[in-house]
Regions:
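Divalent metal-coordination and catalytic microenvironments
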Residues: 9, 38, 53, 63-64, ...
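Acidic, His/Gly-rich catalytic cores of divalent-metal-dependent hydrolytic chemistry
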Residues: 125, 130-234
Length: 234
């Protein structure tokens, strides 16, 4: 039966994604691949990761790095050097891939929702600001969200579902395992790991630590970006 494989922030680490899919026994043409965004920037392989995603029929939500690239593409904002190196080599077809990425993706068969960074508890997702979905890490007792790691509790600690939210964005040494939210960004591009959540057909996501047996990871081939440990040293 078809499975759903949800993978954390890839950042151009094509080799690690291929290794991870081999490890989980991904069945091309049968299993479904879902990506939490930030396919590009900081890592080594811009064209390769997009070609692999296209070949496998992957679905990806939009990450903050795709959003930044698209803002430049529509002549709204300038870019720094990391993004400029990517933006200047993307083809028309690759830009269309980025344009097609939604801010969130619902997986009703798993009672799950995939978003890049997070959701605001108590706020309907179609009423939430795009910035929150793309960048939030924490949220305070007033419901004010922030991209700063020390601005309040992790948003997942305050979210009470349903649906279960699967997200990325905040690179940490280990996955975030909250009751109703699972964070998969384990910092592959910084020399950490690339992590997948593997679900059987129609399988709901277990809550909290119970999800751990469904998580599979591979170690980065090397650090591609940042200083010693990058954000994983926090």
């Amino acid at each position: 039966m078809a499975r759903t494989v949800i993978v954390g922030d890839v950042h151009g680490c094509t080799g690690e994604l291929e290794e991870l899919l081999e490890r989980v026994g991904f069945a091309e043409g049968t299993d479904r691949l879902v990506l939490v965004g930030d396919l590009l920037v900081r890592g080594p392989d811009t064209h390769g990761i997009l070609a692999l995603a296209r070949r496998l029929g992957a679905r990806s939500v939009r990450g903050n790095h795709e959003e930044k690239l698209l803002a430049w593409h529509h002549r709204r904002k300038p870019l720094g050097p990391d993004h400029d190196r990517v933006a200047t080599v993307l083809s028309d077809d690759e830009w269309r891939m980025l344009e097609a990425m939604p801010l969130w993706l619902d997986l009703p068969e798993h009672d799950a929702r995939v978003v890049h960074a997070g959701v605001i508890p108590g706020v309907a997702i179609d009423r939430a600001p795009a910035g929150a979905l793309l960048k939030m890490r924490t949220i305070d007792e007033r419901g004010d969200w922030s991209d700063e790691a020390d601005a309040g509790p992790l948003w997942g600690t305050r979210y009470t579902g349903p649906p279960h939210v699967v997200f990325g964005h905040y690179a940490r040494a280990e996955p975030q395992l909250h009751a109703w939210a699972t964070g998969l960004d384990t910092g592959c591009v910084y020399g950490g790991k690339l992590t997948a959540l593997v679900l059987d057909a129609d399988e709901p996501i277990p809550r909290g630590e119970a999800v751990r047996p469904l998580l599979k990871s591979v170690t980065a081939l090397r650090p591609y970006y940042g200083g010693k440990g990058g954000p994983l040293s926090r």
